[in-house]
């Protein structure tokens, strides 16, 4: 999703026009990455250079309204807490209720090696199973 914001800036066109052009060129779905976790706290601590949660959700909604379904993702296993994960899922659910545009929910496990958070343990298999079960 966040790549679409960059394409829009470079093209200097409205997002709807960018999506229309991409659809006419053969785009059928959008991967939906870059959501990370919808939390202002996490965003400001870890992902401050990326588009924020509201931008991601706005792009997803517009893409779905333009007839381009997507996946929904959440990056887990870093500094997020349970409440932030529930909030993330709730926001995804709201967009899904409005647009019916998400094809799949994909939980993505954080890999801390070679990052500022390499002191954190890898998410456990148990946590992976819990996230998938959601």
Where are the predicted features?
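Short beta-strand/loop segments at the ligand-binding rim of alpha/beta enzyme cores
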Residues: 1-9, 67-69, 134
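Active-site mouth loops of central-metabolism enzymes
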Residues: 2-14, 45-50
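Short, small-residue-enriched loops and turns at beta-alpha junctions
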Residues: 4-8, 77-81, 122-124
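Glycine- and other small-residue-rich loops at beta-strand/loop junctions that grip anionic moieties
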Residues: 11, 48, 74, 108, ...
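Conserved C-terminal portion of the radical SAM core fold
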Residues: 20-35, 54-116, 127-134
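Gly-rich Lys/Arg/Thr-decorated short loops/hinges at beta-loop-alpha junctions or inter-strand turns
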Residues: 40-42
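Short glycine-enriched, charge-decorated loop/helix-capping segments at active-site entrances
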Residues: 44-50, 119-124
